[in-house]
Amino acid sequence: MAVVTMKQLLDSGTHFGHQTRRWNPKMKRFIFTDRNGIYIIDLQQTLTYIDKAYEFVKETVAHGGTVLFVGTKKQAQESIAAEATRVGMPYVNQRWLGGMLTNFTTVHKRLLRLKELEAMEQTGGFEGRTKKEILMLTREMTKLDRTLGGIRDMAKVPSAVWVVDTNKEHLAVAEARKLNIPVIAILDTNCDPDLVDYPIPGNDDAIRSAALLTKVVASAVAEGVQARAGLSADKDAKPEAGAGEPLAEWEQELLSQAAPAAEAAPAAEAAPAAEAAPAAEAQAAPAAEAPAAEAPSTEA
């Protein structure tokens, strides 16, 4: 079964790129056409690249790896936090701190400080201090939780990084590449594909598009975790098809191009079975019927 369908991608607006004047020429091979001054991304390629990224993430997690989810733009913050939390992976959805990967030793010390402050608050460690001291400690804890709360349980640098909008998260991409950490990312028409190891051509500005593709990556993580535990894949982890708005004619045309390819395989399998059925019925027919069928020819 496909990880995600063409209709789901169309419904979420994954095929919409940027205006034709705002593009990266390196993305030309991923562009299907342009409509009203806006590039349309080739979703056939998107489906292919989704499968590649899905398999990579699943295998990475199955072998004990972790995937860091990164998306600090408003359109992606909620889905990044929700999906990463669902599958127990670290995430950054506020501000990317410089050195979060390349200087992880220092970042890890700040994580220990965050846990220390939280423990103090829960065990009554703030008691006996002045109001000003309590206020300063509370502010420090709040700030650390806002910026580092998503990676509080990350004990080492991740095995891979999932990025929504490589242009906005250029620091995260640069640090990952410096450490040779594979980058999986949504590539809009204004992005540089050379910076990404596992690209997924698509719209990184629409909330539904970013949420759908993030859910696909999270589903791959979930399947990898289950494979690591020796459990069967959970079908509910796959994204569900949502009811969308009516498709335009050119969108229906794009969708129809994918239909013959999807129907070809089942049709090819069904043909031999259809031919075999009459032969099986002929062999199973009673012997008494054969003379009755031949009787007219003998009299003639």
Curated annotation (Swiss-Prot):
Entries under InterPro entries matching the protein: Ribosomal_uS2, Ribosomal_uS2_bac/mit/plastid, Ribosomal_uS2_CS, Ribosomal_uS2_flav_dom_sf
PROSITE patterns, per this entry?
RIBOSOMAL_S2_1
Residues of the signal peptide? none
Q: Which UniProt keywords apply?
A: Ribonucleoprotein, Ribosomal protein
Q: Where is the stretch described as Disordered? A: 228-300
UniProt-recorded Gene Ontology molecular function terms: structural constituent of ribosome
- Give Gene Ontology CC terms: cytosolic small ribosomal subunit
Keyword tRNA processing listed? The answer is no
Q: Which GO terms describe its biological process?
A: translation
The residues that cross the membrane are none
Compositional bias annotation for Low complexity: 258-300
Name the protein family: Belongs to the universal ribosomal protein uS2 family.
Q: Spell out the protein name for this chain.
A: Small ribosomal subunit protein uS2
Query: What species is this protein from?
Result: Rhodococcus jostii (strain RHA1)
The gene for this chain is: rpsB
